[in-house]
């Protein structure tokens, strides 16, 4: 499916907000982890460093944008719970239907 210019533009506009929301959740998880008084500081430090190293590669944090991959990127973001299908309400029916079709195929 070729993505429309409108959907491509909307995806680029929305992605940063979706990523910001995802990272806000990560920061809260990190804060809860760091506030655990049962673990020594060194353990928390190294575990946090490992976690950040892994998380910074997550599509909820950073993505390479290619117009030809938008449908798959959206499906991936939904599967990873960065966004929900409802976040696509302003996109074209064609894009929404294609995403829905792919998600249903892989259940």
Describe the function of each predicted region.
Residues 1-107:
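Acidic, Ser/Pro/Thr-rich low-complexity regulatory regions
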